[in-house]
Amino acid sequence: MIEQGNQVLKTLGYTENSKKHAIKVAEHAAEILKITGADAHQIELAQIAGYMHDIGNCINRQDHAHSGAILTYSILKELDMPISDRLTIVTAIGHHDEKTGTALDPVSAALILADKTDVRRNRVQNPVIANFDIHDRVNYAALSSSLEFKTEKKIIQMNLELDDSMCTVMDYFGIFLERMMMCRRAAEVLGWRFKLVANGSKLC
C-alpha cells in the first residue's frame, strides 16, 4: 500500500511518500516521544502510526489521512490489536494532514512533528527542475534538516539549511506556514515549544 500510494503521488507529480519516508517518520516519532518522556507503549503506537500514516494515498491523495485511518483500522483489527490502541493510532493518522487535522494527544503530536519536518532534496520525484512546482522547489532547496531537542528549555527546534538560489527562507515560511503552526500546536500538546531556524534565522 505504501509503495502503491507513492507511485500514485509520483504520477501526479507530488513529493516522495515511499517506505523511506514511512520509516523515517516512524523512527522520528519514536525519538520525539522518548525524549519528551512518553512510555514505551506510546512510543510503539507512534511507530506504527508513523509507518502507516500515508497508506491512504493508494486510494487518493485527496483526503488520504481519513482513508488511511480506515484502512489502518481494518488491518490492525485483523491483527487483533486492542481497540484502544487501534483508536489511538487511527486518530493520529486521521489528524496528520494540516488541512483537516491537529494534534490531540502525544501519539498524534509526535506523528505530526515527525512528518512535517521531513524536508529533504531526495523527496522530489520530478526529474525536470524546470517543471518544479513550489513544493518541489522547497524540498529540493533543503540542503539539510534536523530536529534539535533543548531539554532544559523544553524546545523542539527544526534546523533547516536552504539553498536560497532555489528557495528563500521567506518562501519556505510562506509555503509551509500552516505546517509550522501545526508543529507548534503539536509541541504544545507534548508540553514543549516548537522553534524553526532556517539558514540561521529564527522564524517561529
Where on the chain are the PLM-derived regions?
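Short alpha-helical hairpin
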Residues: 1-7
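N-terminal low-complexity or amphipathic/hydrophobic leaders
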Residues: 8, 24, 28-32
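Divalent metal-dependent catalytic cores for phosphoryl transfer on phosphate-bearing substrates
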Residues: 10-11, 21, 35-149
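Class I (Rossmann-like) S-adenosyl-L-methionine-dependent methyltransferase catalytic domain
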Residues: 14-17
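Electropositive phosphate-/nucleotide-binding environments in soluble metabolic enzymes
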Residues: 19, 23, 177
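Aromatic/hydrophobic pocket-lining residues that form π-stacking "cages" and hydrophobic walls in ligand
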Residues: 29, 110, 183
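Terminal helices and disordered tails flanking the catalytic cores of nucleotide-processing hydrolases
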Residues: 118-204
